[in-house]
Amino acid sequence: MNYNHNQIEKKWQDYWDENKTFKTNDNLGQKKFYALDMFPYPSGAGLHVGHPEGYTATDIISRYKRMQGYNVLHPMGWDAFGLPAEQYALDTGNDPREFTKKNIQTFKRQIKELGFSYDWDREVNTTDPEYYKWTQWIFIQLYNKGLAYVDEVAVNWCPALGTVLSNEEVIDGVSERGGHPVYRKPMKQWVLKITEYADQLLADLDDLDWPESLKDMQRNWIGRSEGAKVSFDVDNTEAEGKVEVFTTRPDTIYGASFLVLSPEHALVNSITTDEYKEKVKAYQTEASKKSDLERTDLAKDKSGVFTGAYAINPLSGEKVQIWIADYVLSTYGTGAIMAVPAHDDRDYEFAKKFDLPIIEVIEGGNVEEAAYTGEGKHINSGELDGLENEAAITKAIQLLEQKGAGEKKVNYKLRDWLFSRQRYWGEPIPVIHWEDGTMTTVPEEELPLLLPETDEIKPSGTGESPLANIDSFVNVVDEKTGMKGRRETNTMPQWAGSCWYYLRYIDPKNENMLADPEKLKHWLPVDLYIGGVEHAVLHLLYARFWHKVLYDLGIVPTKEPFQKLFNQGMILGEGNEKMSKSKGNVINPDDIVQSHGADTLRLYEMFMGPLDAAIAWSEKGLDGSRRFLDRVWRLMVNEDGTLSSKIVTTNNKSLDKVYNQTVKKVTEDFETLGFNTAISQLMVFINECYKVDEVYKPYIEGFVKMLAPIAPHIGEELWSKLGHEESITYQPWPTYDEALLVDDEVEIVVQVNGKLRAKIKIAKDTSKEEMQEIALSNDNVKASIEGKDIMKVIAVPQKLVNIVAK
């Protein structure tokens, strides 16, 4: 008889709910384990089969750690602000709150039906005012620390939609919705000074148990480089000014034959000569239609225009042309570069296209053919001639410093974090702009600053957020002075709520502080964080930044939030393609839970292959996982639902070795998240159980304990069939006996005149004499030596007996 998954799974989910089986108590003295999932955005589509892969992995570890006596924190919540809900509201006229609430209910039902052991009393929702009160509070701390400031930043402005779009909503210079033209337009924006923490964010990666590939992604994103800042005087009687550039190769300055500024550079308009004004203006307009990604595409043809202006090379004294080109971004470095075409591929391409001088300053290449980017001695470089790269860099910086034209500098690719969004569905930024030009943050005791309800969620038309349309929200008067003010109408990005949610789980109902310091001390850092690699840079970098600020403020006790991080792989469609609605190959977990059961889905997703691999979904594999659970059930349970008589309380030793091997292997594999090989070993054990007449009850109990973290519903049901009234959740994890990992018996071969005549199992410690006796009394051997004289018997302990007979 196969087990009825619908009945059993519902029964145990109700039991866990009613008994609050997974409620976490803050036993501050107990050893702890904090297992965290990247909380989902509750979309209208609900859960897909990719979600449970990571969730099952953390759930197995959480259940395993509880059985090992740990105080486990395993929570779940909702990253519920964001664009899709706002888009839905714009399209339907419905409130995004309703949409979000409905989606959360669906997600929660689906997650509960998969049997995850979350403590639902700790659920958080980033759109709950009691939650975003503390998101706003953190913003105020950032502001007070000088880490939040207002700046003019170029944004994607779409006049037809009357709104600012994120980079993801712009495709080839037009809006994703409606295909309207999009322009880059400077607007006042809130920016967070993440660059202040660049060195710490870089250095502390070394202490984290994260995949090296992921650490490298963060290192590259931060992009620390050492070099020099160099000033070129503009050679123009009317326009005073200096062009500042950052270069990692100040030693090549004698080869700098032109400068390139970004089209948005502050100097462009003042230095451009009348003759070139029209061309420059037209080029700036074209550049404003392109995203940064398009502008820096290495494959695209280089474009640019001459400004008519010149600068003076501070070391050679030569005049060099000043150009503008869209491949130089105003947001990177100083927004200007010194071009050394002889030794840089991009500059070489540009110089060739516009017939600009190419001056060789490092020997070893042929600059007629291509840029030379290798090592070599300096030439045509004044005092640097004859020096190799490193020595020349040091000398060049020295010369620049003497002339007051440069200095040694560290640069970062990392930009400050653009923090405001021109959206309605986000956390209001708690700032008031007063009519006298000052601004203040909302007093902390007045938090949360509530997001006003409105049925008019439409773009403001000015580029401000829809909040700008709500006068009752925007306009304020200072009670003490009578001064009028306007509230900030930008809202925070979706990243804000996810920067610190792992802290709120620790103390989710605290009304007086972000979280109790004693509880933070107990639970931090997160011991295991599992999620998709798509969050490798932004979410993880932003969360680390906020955590470091909170550490400096004395609020959190650790420098880093997440000690161990693991990225699960992607589950692909049956044809190895990414699952997507358009391809029609998305698999809904609800259907699988109905047809095969949640335990089967969990087991299958862990058995597909290594947790970090991308693997194609297979219906056959799913069926195979179900068959294994049916085999386990049939081994233990009779047709009438009673426990099989095959399970006995005496040990005939037949399963000693395989049981102890299984406990050892599963324990070791769980520690390394090697769930696929742990499951293989559980299958080996069940196969051995089918080969014997009796199964020792403590061994099958140990097996059920090892199966339960993976397949918890059938685990609980079998545990109760074994005569236990309490849940399996807090039962002690099985242990193994080293001595029983090896056999007490060995198989020996018996040869007569060099020919194999028998294989016999004997005790390991059998003496040579006993081996000879056993061999000679074997029926096959007797038949082979009948009528012959035994000349010699050689016994090799634990191996063989060789009989020579004539």
Swiss-Prot record:
Its EC number is 6.1.1.4. The keyword Protein biosynthesis applies. CDD domains: Anticodon_Ia_Leu_BEm, LeuRS_core. Gene3D superfamilies: 3.10.20.590, HUPs, Isoleucyl-tRNA Synthetase, Domain 1. It comes from the Bacteria. GO terms for cellular component: cytosol. One of its GO terms (molecular function) is leucine-tRNA ligase activity. The keyword Cytoplasm applies. A motif ('HIGH' region) lies at residues 40-51. It is found in: Cytoplasm. It catalyses: tRNA(Leu) + L-leucine + ATP = L-leucyl-tRNA(Leu) + AMP + diphosphate. Its main location: cytoplasm. One of its GO terms (biological process) is leucyl-tRNA aminoacylation. A motif ('KMSKS' region) lies at residues 578-582. It is an enzyme of class 6 (ligase). Keywords: Aminoacyl-tRNA synthetase, ATP-binding, Cytoplasm, Ligase, Nucleotide-binding, Protein biosynthesis. PROSITE patterns: AA_TRNA_LIGASE_I. InterPro entries: aa-tRNA-synth_I_CS, aa-tRNA-synth_Ia, Leu-tRNA-ligase, Leu_tRNA-synth_edit, M/V/L/I-tRNA-synth_anticd-bd, Methionyl/Leucyl_tRNA_Synth, Rossmann-like_a/b/a_fold, tRNAsynth_Ia_anticodon-bd. ATP binds at K581. Belongs to the class-I aminoacyl-tRNA synthetase family. This is Leucine--tRNA ligase. The gene is leuS.
